[in-house]
């Protein structure tokens, strides 16, 4: 019988190791490292000290070698040389079904691909620790800043949905299926907002890379070794092509009448994009929050920030290149998460979408009646599919003696076509297709401090540079190269190691320092 690796990706995977996967932090053995108990009290308050202790135990068990005096080695652990399979996804064969199941997360994110954002050795230690990053005060401030910007632009939609649910005494389930549905509905809302208000925030995108050769998957996703990579775009701006500032958003809703029905809005936007392609462009940007009004000085941090935005732009371009393929890629995205794209969504989810995204109201009526929505692949599938009963009759009692809620009555019955992820994927794919023709080669990094943007870095999209980075990152993730730490120069060690959790137990840093001392002694001995 073939191993999981051979079945998962014939030709590139190594034999599945019986030692299997990196241990989780909660069950790590107490392999204490030399500096344990000597953490700097200034940076190791109780929660952080506890976090570091747990992480050190796990990483020490995997990387510590007696011959190194307890310092952490800078090569991948033996038998765990494929970070994606051994640590991230952790596949195994289900004894009962013979199917491959994943104990971990069988996908990556754009930020996960940026292995050299700081030092790849630190990235590897964190990865193999199997522990989430410690949420620092700076990270919490950054999240709040992002949320504030998002709510300022998109908060009205969320508020409308919340109010409707409260009036109807309904709730949206919080399971993975409904969380993804909410995210996809949010993406639809954001793409509509982009064209109407000239900007959007926190838009989902994704792509696939091949584990076989590390390249972007441009056609259909057919192999398990085509790995899903997801991302969230901080900021998109619809602006005048060749204008003075890429952050000067157009506001088309002031001069154009947008259809309120998605079936009419999609062709309207497609035609609008084609007619205005010479005048308009969509600029993709990322937001970085800072403690001070200073941009990062480390070259690797600046470079990977640029690459991060390039990935987003590339994924948007791929998703918009072929609407039918984008639809299939979205369905695959959900299926890779173990979700059923045809599973009916709860009544609360349907009401939330109708209220939060008015453009989908007419679509909901089409689903109730079993009418086509005007997207071929979706309509063809539902023409022949046998659906389970999708019935909201049990909620009809909520409307009694509430005349202001009677507009929902038509939905509180039996639906001929269920509201599900497949439907949301259809509309998402079509809207991605409206954005792609307008994508700009100018990209942005916006630096914020205290809620204000103090610097904007503009640069050009470089497809060749991105392709090279993707292939290099894939070689790390899929076990085709070793860890590549920072260059062991005095400047680098001073800049990168100072804030590293592993600085006192890192063999790479120790050897670099000893090398400088040895060199200094040799220089002093010169005549």
UniProtKB/Swiss-Prot annotation:
It is found in: Mitochondrion. One of its GO terms (cellular component) is nucleus. Pfam families: Exo5. The keyword Iron applies. [4Fe-4S] cluster binds at residues 119, 497, 500, 506. Its main location: mitochondrion. Its EC number is 3.1.-.-. Signal peptide: none annotated. The keyword Transmembrane does not apply. Its cofactor is Mg(2+); [4Fe-4S] cluster. One of its GO terms (molecular function) is single-stranded DNA 5'-3' DNA exonuclease activity. Keywords: 4Fe-4S, DNA-binding, Exonuclease, Hydrolase, Iron, Iron-sulfur, Magnesium, Metal-binding, Mitochondrion, Nuclease, Transit peptide. InterPro entries: Exo5, EXOV. PANTHER family: EXONUCLEASE V. Single strand DNA specific 5' exonuclease involved in mitochondrial DNA replication and recombination. Releases dinucleotides as main products of catalysis. Has the capacity to slide across 5'double-stranded DNA or 5'RNA sequences and resumes cutting two nucleotides downstream of the double-stranded-to-single-stranded junction or RNA-to-DNA junction, respectively. Monomer. This is Exonuclease V, mitochondrial. The gene is EXO5.
């Amino acid at each position: 019988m073939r191993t999981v690796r051979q079945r998962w990706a014939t030709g590139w995977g190594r034999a599945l190791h019986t030692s299997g996967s990196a241990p989780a932090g909660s069950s790590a053995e107490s392999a204490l490292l030399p500096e344990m108990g000597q953490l700097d009290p200034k940076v190791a308050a109780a929660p952080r000290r506890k976090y570091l202790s747990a992480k050190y135990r796990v990483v020490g068990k995997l990387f510590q070698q007696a011959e190194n005096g307890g310092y952490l080695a800078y090569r991948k652990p033996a038998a765990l040389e494929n970070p994606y399979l051994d640590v991230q996804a952790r596949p195994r064969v289900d004894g009962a079904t013979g199917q491959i199941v994943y104990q971990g997360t069988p996908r990556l994110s754009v930020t996960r691909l940026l292995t050299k954002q700081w030092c790849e050795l630190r990235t590897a230690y964190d990865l193999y620790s199997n522990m989430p990053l410690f949420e620092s005060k700076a990270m919490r401030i950054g999240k709040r800043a992002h949320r504030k910007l998002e709510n300022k632009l998109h908060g009205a939609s969320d508020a409308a949905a919340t109010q409707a649910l409260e009036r109807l005494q309904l709730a949206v389930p919080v399971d993975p299926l409904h969380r993804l549905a909410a995210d996809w509905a949010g993406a639809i809302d954001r793409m509509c907002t982009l064209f109407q208000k000239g900007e959007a925030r926190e838009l989902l995108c994704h792509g696939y890379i091949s584990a076989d050769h590390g390249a972007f998957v441009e056609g259909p996703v057919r192999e398990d070794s085509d790995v899903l990579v997801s991302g969230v775009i901080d900021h998109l701006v619809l602006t005048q092509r060749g204008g003075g500032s890429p952050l000067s958003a157009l506001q088309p809703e002031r001069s154009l009448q947008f259809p309120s029905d998605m079936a009419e809005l999609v062709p309207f936007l497609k035609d609008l994009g084609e007619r205005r392609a010479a005048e308009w462009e969509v600029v993709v940007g990322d937001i970085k929050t800072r403690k001070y009004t200073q941009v990062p000085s480390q070259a690797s941090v600046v470079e990977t920030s640029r690459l991060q935005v390039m990935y987003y732009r590339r994924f948007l371009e791929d998703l918009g290149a072929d609407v039918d393929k984008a639809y299939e890629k979205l369905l695959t995205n959900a299926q890779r998460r173990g979700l059923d794209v045809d599973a009916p969504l709860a009544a609360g989810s349907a009401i939330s979408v109708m209220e939060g995204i008015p453009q989908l109201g007419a679509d909901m009526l089409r689903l109730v009646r079993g009418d086509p929505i005007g997207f071929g692949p979706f309509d063809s599938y539902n023409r022949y599919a046998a659906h389970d009963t999708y019935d909201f009759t049990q909620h009809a009692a909520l409307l009694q003696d509430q005349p202001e809620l009677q507009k929902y009555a038509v939905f509180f019955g039996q639906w001929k076509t269920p509201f599900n992820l497949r439907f949301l994927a259809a509309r998402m794919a079509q809207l991605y297709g409206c954005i792609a023709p307008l994508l700009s080669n100018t990209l942005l990094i916006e630096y914020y401090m205290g809620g204000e943007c103090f610097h904007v870095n503009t640069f050009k999209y470089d497809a060749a540079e991105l392709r090279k980075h993707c292939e290099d990152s894939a070689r790390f993730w899929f076990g085709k190269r070793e860890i590549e730490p920072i260059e062991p120069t005095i400047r680098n060690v001073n800049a990168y190691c100072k804030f590293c959790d592993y600085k006192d137990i890192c063999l790479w840093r120790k050897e670099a320092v000893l090398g400088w001392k040895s060199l200094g002694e040799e220089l002093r001995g010169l005549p």
